[in-house]
């Protein structure tokens, strides 16, 4: 089977998160000479395949087989791959069965490697992601099988194939501020404490503010207000409470404690509560590390392009590898149609991605 045939086969599985729809068992059979470990929990399947070629380092390719629901607006069946004008249309074409097909085919054809090659695949990245890669890595750590390096084949390229890799990701801090006032009649504002009026005074000082200056790899951490709600949708009652929700995509310079101090600076003296949670921690892989250097060279060899090192975008499963000290990068096809109707990627990109991964294995 060639990489494009494998790609089409994977696209035909209707693997809407967290259902792998049989795709993981298919991959296990396709790589039958690799040892297989299953880490399944709460309806989520995780497959770890590994093969020890030598006594050297452990390189893991990682990704997810689950996809988001297709939604409306498709011009073809989202789970029947359509080949047209050099593109393949299907849900998951970019995010991220192209990446999975490329590294599965690359490791299948590997004859020589100085250490251990492995694959970690999950059926829950697009959903809650609690029992996916995160859980599988917990089990691998317990078994002393954590890799030294990881390549997550998420779609990273922007304008053309090979133009960007991710060497890190911002974290995500979520917050809810509740300002407590005193409900009253709109005609007697002096007898009430209107939380909207109180909060309105500080909003210009908080909304969209940079919490740090960023650096050469990360944009500044920005305080982004996502929702404000208060009152009963009437015109003659001032509310007794106001709730404001926000998000900070933080770099390595800003912590949850920094966000707490920032909020307190403006809400000090008000009657308020603050709830904070961190759904993802920021990480950065050293640009001089082996995995970054090897992927850079492989991309340059196969495309003639030197990729930029990016940390932009949302979160991914790469963050879970980083938490275990795994030197992790992300590289895949372009990402201009992810989660959209008529998602597509070009056959040429998939073939080039497969060749890049083959070169990584050869030269690592």
Swiss-Prot record:
Q: Which Pfam families match?
A: M20_dimer (PF07687), Peptidase_M20 (PF01546)
Q: Does the keyword Ribonucleoprotein apply?
A: no
List, from the UniProt record, the residues annotated as the active site of this protein. Answer: 66, 125
Instruction: Please give the family membership noted in the entry.
Output: Belongs to the peptidase M20A family. DapE subfamily.
Cofactor info, note text: Binds 2 Zn(2+) or Co(2+) ions per subunit.
- Classification via InterPro entries: ArgE/DapE_CS, Bact_exopeptidase_dim_dom, DapE_proteobac, Peptidase_M20, Peptidase_M20_dimer, Peptidase_M20A
Give the cofactors, semicolon-separated. Answer: Zn(2+); Co(2+)
Q: How does it assemble?
A: Homodimer.
Does the keyword Cell cycle feature in the UniProt annotation? no
Residues annotated to bind Zn(2+) 2:
95, 126, 339
Catalysed reactions, as listed in the record = N-succinyl-(2S,6S)-2,6-diaminopimelate + H2O = (2S,6S)-2,6-diaminopimelate + succinate
UniProt name for this protein: Succinyl-diaminopimelate desuccinylase
What keywords tag this UniProt record?
Answer: Amino-acid biosynthesis, Cobalt, Diaminopimelate biosynthesis, Hydrolase, Lysine biosynthesis, Metal-binding, Zinc
Give the protein's function: Catalyzes the hydrolysis of N-succinyl-L,L-diaminopimelic acid (SDAP), forming succinate and LL-2,6-diaminopimelate (DAP), an intermediate involved in the bacterial biosynthesis of lysine and meso-diaminopimelic acid, an essential component of bacterial cell walls.
The pathway where this protein functions is:
Amino-acid biosynthesis; L-lysine biosynthesis via DAP pathway; LL-2,6-diaminopimelate from (S)-tetrahydrodipicolinate (succinylase route): step 3/3
Instruction: Please tell me where Zn(2+) 1 binds in this chain.
Output: 64, 95, 154
